[in-house]
């Protein structure tokens, strides 16, 4: 079973976006809202990083608001899953909504992993790349 770390916005701010992933078969998920001790940064930060380190894939949804924590999670996963800086990470999916700003940064983000614009596209991409990594 492939493990997926779900990074990004909390369900309450993004229409329960993570719940659609959890319906998928053949995957297990680390959802920081439930699987990391949210008592304080002293507990959730190491729990989140352990979940990322143990993951085969990451789906990140930074939403449209500032998402500093999400970008830290993405960077850590990217660093663990590429051989050298600048490589494309074939295990990383980022949901980049069309209304996300600033738009100039999408050129940079495109170099990191797969960029999709919706949860539906992210689910399709996850299923596709999981087959390639069997």
Question: What is the role of each PLM region?
Answer:
Residues 1-134:
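Conserved catalytic or regulatory cores that recognize and/or transform ribose-phosphate-containing ligands
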